[in-house]
């Protein structure tokens, strides 16, 4: 708690007797209502006035559901059984002795700058030092609801209000349960200690603060102008923070903290801000939190601003409301316009972050009574979010919408497709982003997408990565007109788009029943081809270059190779395979097989040869065999997107029709394929083995 330095050396002033447990909040409309008059430097009566800087907890949020979330266990503990008074203690300050024991244990400590054990409450705000005129306070008191009376000292957790003359410092220690009450002027400090756990720090206006602690961390914070504060703690979890003006009364500390009048089930958190940044905090069940803001700050001449007049009208209209509603309205009158509330809820912490409330928002939506008790305010809805769920008013704030948007999992843009959509030979498009929906393919552009891309290819989509770009890719349909067709060039573009992490639409095309719209789109062109923002791209090599240039870092990964020789590695393998599989003459088969093996051995040598970045110039060990996963390193590149689909076809078709397999001694090729089969970008874009075999059924004829 921010503590102001206390002036010393000022003569003590008259002190009031401690007989009165706590000042009682007067009824609205009566002269001298709570918060209506400021106490002067002289003539302070302990039996009639509350200490300076205390705010009426009953009035500013002690009787309603508004309770602060800041239940803070103070660090001050003591077990003193004797009463002491320092020199300079005012004669009027009476210290009860052992005969005046209360039923609870209580410890009072002065909140001097040296007391660092006291935790500093959050949300503490300073006010302007000037007191507003008495008529203003009386007028505000008339607007507030009836306040139930309570006592400040009694049983366990009782609070002690004490103030001394300017600069005086009073320390009093008494037996268990003794209470100390003293009143004085600005800057006075009273320290009184009782049994372990209870403590009270009291100061007057201009930096004075009062803190009282009860069992298990219950607390009440009431702050006045320029940092005045009162902290009183009650049962575990319940806390109230309230701020008022100089001279306002504070009531806190009935048996076991009941006098705090939390009014909300344990765990609720309410934050309400008053004039000049004052705040009220209270906690309730299940981490529910609420902050109220909106009362205008009064001008220096005592006149109410237009916002205050509007609040007066609202208060007038509140006649006939329940006491809880009126208490809520009274709490709202202690707020500053423009102060934005925030909810804080976390499991076990009763903290929740929420958006901002504005005066005049739509009606509040209330959850069930099992969750929390909340009163509706005429000012508008209050934020209602909990750790287990949320309820928002129709006029939810931008922060609320942003939080909801943030709550949407980014996993929606996943790198895997959960299901396979129907591949229509008639050219129907399917969105490839892991969350396909009916009619999505016909959308011109998905939310947040930069481009509209359609890829017409020949393979069926089983999974794809996703990002911000919608691509339409047209695939060649399989032999049944719907399933994946075999085409290494289509899979090449598939892999590139997946590795780039983009959203794109895929359309399979049945070449026997090619739709008229596709013929008009790319006349005389067979898949694969692509449309990018309406522009048709038909050449596979140019599409690859275009995508690498258009979808460039830093947003999209670079897929180009670092070593130029990786681009040409294995470029003759597929040609040798085609000659080998198409040959039907037995006498020529051996020659074609040797040519294929030669090309494969060349590729295997490159895969086993270490790349320059694999060789450590400072290492004493020579690297003779590469351990990289792919052609250009451990990551897939454009070269892999070109070569891997071809190697996969060779492996399937050669075994099926020529009983040919890659030799086991070609460790580089097998390591390369095994690493590729471990990547979804490759395996999930491969056509089925049956589709590949069917595609070569006419080509791979029996040898004669």
Curated annotation (Swiss-Prot):
Activity modulation comment: Channel activity is redox- and pH-regulated. Inhibited by IAA-94.
Segments of skewed composition (Basic and acidic residues): 67-83, 121-147, 350-360, 371-385, 434-446
Phosphoserine: residues carrying this PTM: 44, 397, 442
Record field: compositional bias (Low complexity): 1-13, 90-100
Region of interest (13 X 10 AA tandem repeat of G-D-[SNG]-[VIM]-[DEQ]-A-[EAG]-[GDVE]-[PRG]-[LAVP]), residue spans: 157-282
Region described as Disordered: 1-446
Chain span(s) of sequence motif G-site: 487-490
Major location (coarse): cytoplasm
SUPFAM superfamilies, per the entry: GST C-terminal domain-like, Thioredoxin-like
Molecular function as annotated in GO: chloride channel activity; D2 dopamine receptor binding; D3 dopamine receptor binding; D4 dopamine receptor binding; oxidoreductase activity
Enzyme Commission code(s) on record: 1.8.-.-
Phosphoprotein keyword on record: yes
Key words, A-Z: Cell membrane, Chloride, Chloride channel, Cytoplasm, Ion channel, Ion transport, Membrane, Oxidoreductase, Phosphoprotein, Repeat, Transmembrane, Transmembrane helix, Transport, Voltage-gated channel
GST C-terminal domain segment(s): 556-704
Tissue spec. comment: Expressed in brain, placenta, pancreas, liver, lung, heart, kidney, liver, spleen, soleus muscle, and brown fat.
Reaction equations catalysed: chloride(in) = chloride(out)
Highest taxon listed in the record's lineage: Eukaryota
Domain notes: The active G-site contains a monothiol Cys-X-X-Ser motif which mediates glutathione-dependent redox catalysis.
Function (record text): In the soluble state, catalyzes glutaredoxin-like thiol disulfide exchange reactions with reduced glutathione as electron donor. Can insert into membranes and form voltage-dependent chloride-selective channels. The channel opens upon membrane depolarization at positive voltages and closes at negative membrane voltages. May play a critical role in water-secreting cells, possibly through the regulation of chloride ion transport.
Family to which this protein belongs: Belongs to the chloride channel CLIC family.
Protein's name according to its UniProt entry: Chloride intracellular channel protein 6
Organism of origin: Homo sapiens
């Amino acid at each position: 708690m921010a503590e102001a330095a206390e002036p010393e050396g000022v003569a003590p002033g008259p002190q009031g007797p401690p007989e009165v447990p706590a000042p009682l909040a007067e009824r609205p409309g009566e002269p001298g209502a709570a918060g209506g008059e400021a106490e002067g430097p002289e003539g302070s009566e302990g039996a009639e006035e509350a200490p300076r800087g205390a705010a009426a907890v009953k009035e500013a949020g002690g009787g309603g559901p508004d309770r602060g979330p800041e239940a803070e266990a103070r660090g001050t503990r003591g077990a003193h059984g004797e009463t002491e008074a320092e020199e300079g203690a005012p004669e009027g300050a009476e210290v009860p002795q052992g005969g005046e024991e209360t039923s609870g244990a209580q410890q009072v400590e002065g909140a001097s700058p040296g007391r660092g054990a006291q935790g500093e409450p959050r949300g503490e705000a300073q006010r302007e030092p000037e007191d507003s005129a008495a008529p203003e306070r009386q007028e505000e008191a008339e607007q507030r609801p009836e306040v139930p009376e309570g006592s400040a000292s009694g049983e366990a957790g009782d609070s002690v209000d004490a103030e001394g003359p300017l600069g005086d410092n009073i320390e009093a220690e008494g037996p268990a349960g003794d209470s100390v009450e003293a009143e004085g002027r600005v800057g006075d400090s009273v320290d009184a200690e009782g049994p372990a756990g209870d403590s009270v720090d009291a100061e007057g206006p201009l930096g004075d603060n009062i803190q009282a602690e009860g069992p298990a961390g219950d607390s009440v914070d009431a702050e006045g102008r320029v940092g005045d504060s009162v902290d009183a703690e009650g049962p575990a979890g319940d806390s109230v923070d309230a701020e008022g003006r100089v001279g306002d009364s504070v009531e806190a500390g009935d048996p076991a903290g009941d006098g705090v009048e939390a009014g909300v089930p344990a765990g609720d958190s309410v934050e309400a801000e008053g004039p000049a940044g004052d705040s009220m905090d209270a906690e309730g069940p299940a981490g529910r939190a609420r902050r109220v803001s909106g009362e205008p700050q009064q001008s220096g001449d005592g006149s109410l601003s237009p916002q205050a007049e509007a609040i007066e009208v609202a208060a007038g209209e509140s006649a006939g409301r329940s006491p809880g509603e009126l208490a809520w309205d009274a709490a709202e009158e202690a707020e500053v316009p423009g102060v934005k509330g925030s909810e804080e809820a976390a499991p076990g912490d009763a903290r929740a972050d929420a958006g901002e409330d504005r005066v005049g928002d739509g009606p509040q939506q209330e959850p069930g009574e099992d969750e929390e008790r909340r009163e509706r305010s005429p000012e508008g809805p209050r934020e209602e979010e909990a750790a287990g769920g949320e309820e928002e008013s129709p006029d939810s704030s931008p922060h609320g919408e942003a939080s909801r948007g943030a709550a949407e999992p980014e996993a929606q843009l996943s790198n895997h497709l959960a299901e396979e959509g129907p591949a229509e030979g008639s050219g129907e498009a399917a969105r490839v982003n892991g969350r396909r929906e009916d009619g999505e393919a016909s959308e011109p552009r998905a939310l947040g997408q930069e481009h509209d891309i359609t890829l017409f290819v020949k393979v069926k989509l089983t999974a794809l990565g996703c990002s911000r770009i919608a691509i339409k890719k047209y695939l060649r349909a399989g032999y049944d007109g719907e399933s994946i067709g075999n085409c290494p060039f289509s899979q090449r573009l598939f892999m590139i788009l997946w590795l780039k992490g983009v959203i794109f639409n895929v359309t399979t095309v049945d070449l026997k029943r090619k739709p008229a719209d596709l013929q008009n789109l790319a006349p005389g062109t067979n898949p694969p081809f692509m449309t990018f923002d309406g522009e048709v791209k038909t050449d596979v090599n140019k599409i690859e270059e275009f995508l690498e240039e258009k979808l460039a870092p830093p947003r999209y990964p670079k897929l180009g190779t670092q070593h130029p020789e990786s681009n040409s590695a294995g470029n003759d393998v597929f040609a040798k395979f085609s000659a080998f599989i198409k040959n039907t003459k037995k006498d020529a088969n051996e020659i074609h097989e040797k040519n294929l093996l030669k090309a494969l051995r060349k590729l295997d040598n490159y895969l086993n040869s270490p790349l320059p970045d694999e060789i450590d110039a400072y290492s004493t060990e020579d690297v003779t065999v590469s351990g990289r996963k792919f052609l250009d390193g451990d990551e897939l590149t454009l070269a892999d997107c070109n070569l891997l689909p071809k190697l996969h076809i060779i492996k399937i078709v050669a075994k099926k029709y020529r009983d040919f397999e890659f030799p086991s001694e070609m460790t580089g090729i097998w390591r390369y394929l095994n690493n590729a089969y471990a990547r979804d970008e490759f395996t999930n874009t491969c056509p089925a083995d049956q589709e590949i075999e069917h595609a070569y059924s006419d080509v791979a004829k029996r040898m004669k």
